Amino acid sequence: MYDWLNALPKAELHLHLEGSLEPELLFALAERNKIALPWNDVETLRGAYAFNNLQEFLDLYYQGADVLRTEQDFYDLTWAYLQRCKAQNVVHTEPFFDPQTHTDRGIAFEVVLNGISQALKDGREQLGISSGLILSFLRHLSEDEAHKTLDQALPFRDAFIAVGLDSSEMGHPPRKFQRVFDRARSEGFVAVAHAGEEGPPEYIWEALDLLKIKRIDHGVRAIEDERLMQRIIEEQIPLTVCPLSNTKLCVFDHMSQHNILDMLERGVKVTVNSDDPAYFGGYVTENFHALHTHLGMTEDQARRLAQNSLDARLI
């Protein structure tokens, strides 16, 4: 079944480029940039990839991202991810990147963007993988900081297809960012946002009604609110669900408890994605395979999930 799932044409709509930084590349970049790491070797680092919640993961994620310093680093990161896409027949990807993760430590916005954009361009030309980049605001920072990031992005308007919202969800509701999303949409950006991963269904309502998003990233807690479910089904609002991430971060205790197939059968436009694959134990095919192994996902369900991902593209 793995090989069949791997060959299935699919799109990835929820992927953080910084979260695809495999330990081997992390160590190579640290050596290239002469950065001392708190881990002795790759295996020690992999052993640290055990998380009880989103915040524990984010603490390690931001620590790992510190090795990314130059255009070449960001190119290598993105190119390595695109090669994974090619190997798994991901024909289209819409990755997030978090400029504030890098600008806050003194890396110029254009350094980050140039490296990523060149790799995506090469991916289109050399690998045949279409793509669109999503600029994501960090919700644990202030809305003023998000405005500054948008200011930095506007000269490179054509490099992005959308703005997003990610990082620590609890205590940072979507309404905190209503003004910057209003401004981004007025500049022509489409909006997406993480909501309903650890946060309650109310956060999904806010993302839809205040941020006016076109796609919900995660959204698994929508199933707790029947009125919300009806709206998502009726309006066919896509959900970019990340099964391995959800179990690794204890949103669900075990994959057998995941609700993605229940949502699929109710008519929700759910998609399968890897989120931060270097940290969560698998790329898109591994996520599909986990659904087959633990939830008994059928070939028909896999085809529908893959088609949903292609239908839910922003471009």
Curated annotation (Swiss-Prot):
Its EC number is 3.5.4.2. Gene3D superfamilies: Metal-dependent hydrolases. The lineage of its organism: Bacteria, Pseudomonadati, Pseudomonadota, Gammaproteobacteria, Pseudomonadales. It comes from Pseudomonas putida (strain GB-1). Keywords: Hydrolase, Metal-binding, Nucleotide metabolism, Zinc. SUPFAM superfamilies: Metallo-dependent hydrolases. The keyword Hydrolase applies. PANTHER family: ADENINE DEAMINASE. It catalyses: adenine + H2O + H(+) = hypoxanthine + NH4(+). This is Adenine deaminase.
